[in-house]
């Protein structure tokens, strides 16, 4: 990548080498990858299923059914065997705990209000769920070993909603994208978590809010631990990226992204923190995080919905609203050019592969 004062490096993907994986379960709302890079999980909210994809063969390895309108999915960096999925019914929203090795739903945690996003602490002990209610918004904190629930109040005013929740690399702070009648904001929460994973006495608390003019669409955290990138969008101004110093709780730069003409929906950072992938209606726009200059576009699908990089930073996985997963090798990657072993772009056969079973251990009480 380029230095701030040097020429901007360009970014591009060889579309001829992209592998398409038909999931066959309608629009994909969210995607995550296991910390070992072996599995991808995608939520198919229209078909009440979650699909598990083997990243080695680029085929659907299994489908977990019976999950009502699954939306957000999060996996723990501490354990590749478990995933957390938000679901919604007319009566309640819930967090489903899934063993992705055995494909079993091992626990269900019913919650009040409407869930908007999920995040897992680095040690896997705490699960954070941003929620929206008729009168305000909050974050629910689940202890994954005891099932205890803590609620962090964000706002008690009607019309205030959460867009997303992110947790810092040390687990000590949460960052929540919040929208209200007067615009968006970034709420900063102290979690009272020590570096050894245990809790300091007292409760988690809101310690600050960075006000933004436009509705927040997504938040991503830089690798330095002190920077948050906030993507926002409005019908008149368009798409904007704000860079926030999380220590001082101030905006250090604002960049309008004229290259994005449609509505901005999601944002994800590359593993090295050098690039921001911004998803809009028909493309993924790639920005350099140092200068916020546009480096290029990813057009592997017509209507992208979510994406994630592989843990080693070699591959980009892009899901779309047609139920298709595109696998592309990143230009900076060091892996072989072929993104999948033994996969055919036109082969939509479901693989019967299952990994070796690991010993079962409880996640949530």
Question: Where are the language model's segments positioned?
Answer:
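Predominantly soluble domains enriched in secretory-pathway, periplasmic, or organellar proteins
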Residues: 1-365
């Amino acid at each position: 990548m380029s230095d701030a004062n040097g020429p901007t490096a360009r970014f591009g993907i060889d579309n001829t080498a992209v592998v398409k994986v038909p999931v066959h379960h309608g629009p994909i709302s969210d995607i995550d990858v296991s910390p070992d890079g072996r599995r991808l999980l995608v939520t198919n909210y229209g078909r009440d299923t979650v699909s598990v994809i083997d990243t080695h063969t680029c085929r659907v390895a299994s489908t977990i059914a019976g999950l009502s309108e699954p939306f957000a999915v999060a996996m723990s960096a501490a354990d590749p065997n478990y995933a957390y999925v938000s679901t919604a019914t007319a009566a309640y929203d819930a967090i489903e705990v899934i063993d992705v090795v055995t494909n079993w739903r091992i626990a269900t945690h019913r919650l009040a209000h409407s869930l908007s996003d999920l995040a897992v602490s680095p040690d896997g002990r705490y699960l954070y769920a941003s929620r929206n209610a008729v009168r305000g918004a909050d974050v629910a904190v689940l202890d994954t070993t005891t099932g205890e629930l803590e609620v962090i109040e964000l706002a008690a005013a009607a019309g205030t909603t959460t867009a997303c929740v992110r947790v810092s690399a040390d687990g000590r702070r949460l960052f929540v994208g919040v929208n209200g009648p007067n615009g968006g904001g970034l709420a900063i929460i102290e979690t009272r978590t020590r570096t050894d994973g245990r809790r300091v006495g007292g409760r988690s608390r809101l310690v600050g809010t960075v006000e933004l003019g436009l509705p927040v669409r997504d938040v991503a955290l830089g690798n330095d631990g002190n920077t948050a990138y906030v993507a926002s969008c409005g019908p008149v101004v368009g798409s904007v990226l704000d860079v926030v110093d999380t220590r001082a709780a101030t905006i250090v730069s604002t960049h309008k992204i004229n290259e994005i003409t449609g509505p901005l929906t999601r944002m994800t950072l590359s593993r090295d923190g050098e690039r921001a992938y911004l998803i809009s209606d028909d493309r993924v726009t790639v920005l350099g995080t140092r200068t916020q200059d546009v480096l290029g576009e990813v057009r592997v699908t017509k209507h992208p919905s979510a994406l994630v990089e592989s843990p080693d930073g070699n591959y980009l996985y892009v899901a779309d609203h047609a139920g298709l997963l595109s696998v592309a090798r990143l230009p900076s990657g060091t892996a072989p050019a072929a993104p999948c072993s033994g996969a055919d772009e036109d082969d939509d056969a479901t693989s019967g592969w299952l990994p070796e079973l690991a010993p079962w251990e409880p996640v949530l009480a």
